[in-house]
UniProtKB/Swiss-Prot annotation:
Name of the protein in question: Putative thiosulfate sulfurtransferase
Keyword Transmembrane: no
Catalytic activity, as annotated: thiosulfate + hydrogen cyanide = thiocyanate + sulfite + 2 H(+)
Keywords: Repeat, Transferase
Domain of life: Bacteria
Alphabetized SMART domains for the sequence: RHOD
UniProt free text on domains: The structure consists of 2 domains of very similar conformation, suggesting a common evolutionary origin. However, the sequences of the 2 domains are very different.
Annotated function: May be a sulfotransferase involved in the formation of thiosulfate.
Chain residues that bind substrate: 238
Residues annotated as catalytic: 233
SS bond partners: none
Gene3D superfamilies assigned: Rhodanese-like domain
EC code: 2.8.1.1
Amino acid sequence: MSREEVLVSTDWAEQNLNTDGVVFAEVDEDTTAYDGGHIPGAIKLDWKNELQDHVRRDFVNREGFEKLLSAKGIGNDDTVILYGGNNNWFAAYAYWYFKLYGHSDVKLLDGGRKKWELDGRELTKEEPNRAATAYKAQEPDASIRAFRDEVVDAIGNKNLVDVRSPDEFAGKLLAPAHLPQESAQRAGHIPSAINVPWSKAANEDGTFKSDEELKQVYGEAGLDTDKDTIAYCRIGERSSHTWFVLRELLGHTNVKNYDGSWTEYGSLVGVPIENPQEQGA
């Protein structure tokens, strides 16, 4: 898949802010970031309150996704451009959601909010008022999502890519350092997993590294491109970014995102775990 099919530049974005059929949407870890200023015409997608089920741990179901996108004024034929802060990590999470429900024309703004701001481009607090649509989603695409049983079976057989920080992988932390350390019952990583922090795929300005650089990053870490791959992190957002890199940029079609990730796996009873911190004690 060429980059033009899944990425747009900030130049392209600025030239297409008012193009019919193009919808910009901001998705941030900090769901209030949009309110302080966003790309003109962009809508807000709240990953926590709008893309997640409020009762069970799962994403919104098909009907919920249809209702959300209809209310946001997104049509089935629209080109959706997703962007956000911190190298697009939650924008990539939303991209994965859109692909799960079959929206074919969705792309990331290369560099996200960081690149847009570094360029000195306009931000506004004005919120758009888009007419509602009647969006229709497809059934979830099971080929891009991994569940716990498949993950356990993958140990020693498939590529397991832990995209968390080295300290999380080593069992020193349960979550990123700036977050509460209470997401899983146990620390460590899935046996046979390689550690390739998701942020290694990004340049300083938030844009993605070149294909050659990305291949080197994963090749040096020991990724076997002949095997199926499952990426995981803590809740599935950082691993969505790695899933995007491996599948959409590098063209590995046999890649799944395990959105249960360490929050689920680290709390399962009886599954194997490697924890260098405990083993070295």
